[in-house]
Amino acid sequence: MKLTCVLIIAVLFLIVCQLNTADDSRDKQEYRAVRLRDAIRNSRGSRSCGNLGESCSAHRCCPGLMCMGEASICIPY
């Protein structure tokens, strides 16, 4: 009997949490495409040059940086 009550309370608690989360995120999907575009634009694979401290073995360093060292990382001139 106690186990049944605990299970019922746990299920009700989880349902309330899901409903509360779904209600909070209802209006935030409006700009989803913009966030996705920005994430793709800023991803490591889409950049054409490496920033300070990044590896330059797969791509060239950004302007003002040069590839140097055994680890092949981008450093300032």
Curated annotation (Swiss-Prot):
Membrane in keyword set: no
Molecular function via GO: ion channel inhibitor activity; toxin activity
Gene Ontology cellular component annotations, sorted alphabetically: extracellular region
Keyword Repressor (UniProt): no
UniProt propeptide residues: 23-47
Main location: secreted
Signal peptide range: 1-22
Domain notes: The presence of a 'disulfide through disulfide knot' structurally defines this protein as a knottin.
Name listed for the protein in its UniProt record: Conotoxin ArMKLT2-0322
